[in-house]
């Protein structure tokens, strides 16, 4: 299930990495609305299975390049971020006490919490790059100067409802 979305997610990461000029150990923030992937209004159609499928595909693609990731939760958790503890410590980010759920944090960040080795939530980061799937507004978690990149893969196999 969701094979097309996984393939598309890997293509997004590959195209992004070709343009973004990141190095091993850099941090990327990912915001992802499963509602938007499924052609619904953001926040209205959270899908845990879709979030998990897309997260695992993207996590694997970034891991191959040794790029660290953080996932942005939704506004119910004040857009907190889920990140590996080792990365939070390496970058000096302060941990906050929240745990994402599909309808409070988002399905994508819930999957991150489930599949990261030692996940923690942090309030803010300054990532070197970011991918925003579904207009989740990740800009607050990027460095002050960020250059947008345009990729060919614009959608993750949008279903029609």
Annotated model-derived regions:
Residues 19, 59, 100, 146-153:
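A generic local secondary-structure boundary/capping motif
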Residues 23, 38, 43-46, 132, ...:
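Generic, ordered loop/turn and secondary-structure boundary motif
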């Amino acid at each position: 299930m969701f094979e097309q979305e996984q393939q598309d997610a890997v293509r997004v990461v590959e195209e992004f990495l070709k343009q973004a000029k990141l190095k091993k150990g850099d941090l990327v923030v990912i915001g992802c609305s499963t509602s938007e992937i499924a052609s619904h209004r953001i926040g209205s159609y959270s899908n845990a299975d879709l979030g998990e499928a897309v997260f695992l595909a993207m996590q694997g693609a970034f891991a191959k390049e040794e790029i660290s990731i953080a996932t942005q939760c939704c506004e119910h958790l004040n857009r907190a971020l889920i990140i590996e503890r080792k990365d939070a410590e390496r970058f000096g980010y302060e941990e906050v006490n929240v745990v994402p759920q599909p309808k409070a944090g988002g399905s994508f960040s819930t999957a991150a919490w489930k599949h990261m080795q030692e996940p923690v939530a942090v309030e803010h980061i300054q990532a070197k790059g970011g991918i925003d799937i579904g207009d989740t507004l990740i800009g607050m978690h990027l460095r002050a100067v960020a250059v947008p990149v345009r990729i060919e893969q614009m959608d993750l196999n949008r279903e029609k409802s």
